[in-house]
């Protein structure tokens, strides 16, 4: 009897089999906000016969995952069932087309700094690197509340405490991913950023959980941003919980048309634009952002914009400011603050030693048309009664910043104040600049 071709694949590739179990992909949509012309993945793949189940593998699951992706590409589903999957080979999944990834198992990455120093996918921007990356068109990646990606962060943070130059990969990355959804995954203890969204468009990310816990006080978690978005547009991140030690979300250069909504962030540095303008001569653009309905607790800031100042005219090749570009059309609305140091921090003098030096070399990156609206809650005692900072390097490069409907109380109960510098024609009637 002639064996069906898919059974033959099972015989020749023991790590891969065709499963009769068809995981149920969630139906999710951007709500209540979305960018114009937003088009994430078209929904669950229709084929119920083309489901490639990858067997758990505690030596190296990467070959099995890669084989499944090739076999079930163009209309199928890759299924990682409950069990342990150790990835010990860098996994390039940037060829995907019309495919689902159902991750119900526990994914970890081999603890081997030398291995990942040579194998991880390297990016010049802020020396980011990735264990694995997803790219392609019309892709759904989902965990249904079962899947876990564990970065074993303490191993990497301890190594960094001994050698600050240790390369630490991000836990999940997209590079050239278009029309996609990512949902229902728990991510633990990332060595570096949890997620890098690069060179991608039309991605809906929903119902994610990200948790960081350091076990050694002398080797704390470092750089555990929830999401870093870089050279990407039409992105929605929503309905997720993040407990970390760095930015909850960070908009890196050339992030546009993005909605962030319904997040619960704890212990972070806030929802941050930047830092931008760090590299002399390079142009960074971040515009058309809507950040809505965020709960922020025990953070340094709720809403934050970080821009480097300019540099002296005779400077060449600076990596400490002098970059070009703009931050434009950014809205933070309906933000709940609990015990955060500042509710709003705008700095066009990021990493500058003092305001006088920053005033001498104003930023070449313009901030304009920014709205902070409807902030409620409390701040910490760190700057009491100051609840925010608005610092531009010159009124010539800082326009139309509006702060309104602020109902935030410092611990002392005194009238809240802001530090304000070079704000020019901004609309600050609803706050007190001290």
Curated annotation (Swiss-Prot):
Its EC number is 3.2.1.67. It is an enzyme of class 3 (hydrolase). GO terms for cellular component: extracellular region. Residues 1-19 form the signal peptide. The active site is at 246 (proton donor), 269. Glycans are attached at residues 46, 57, 106, 199, 207, 254, 293, 329, 354, 400. It catalyses: [(1->4)-alpha-D-galacturonosyl](n) + H2O = alpha-D-galacturonate + [(1->4)-alpha-D-galacturonosyl](n-1). Its main location: secreted. The keyword Plastid does not apply. One of its GO terms (molecular function) is polygalacturonase activity. It is found in: Secreted. GO terms for biological process: carbohydrate catabolic process; cell wall organization; pectin catabolic process. InterPro entries: Glyco_hydro_28 (IPR000743), Pectin_lyas_fold (IPR012334), Pectin_lyase_fold/virulence (IPR011050). PbH1 repeats lie at residues 232-253, 255-275. It holds the Pfam family Glyco_hydro_28. Disulfide bonds join 248-265, 392-398. Keywords: Cell wall biogenesis/degradation, Disulfide bond, Glycoprotein, Glycosidase, Hydrolase, Repeat, Secreted, Signal. Belongs to the glycosyl hydrolase 28 family. Specific in hydrolyzing the terminal glycosidic bond of polygalacturonic acid and oligogalacturonates. This is Probable exopolygalacturonase A.
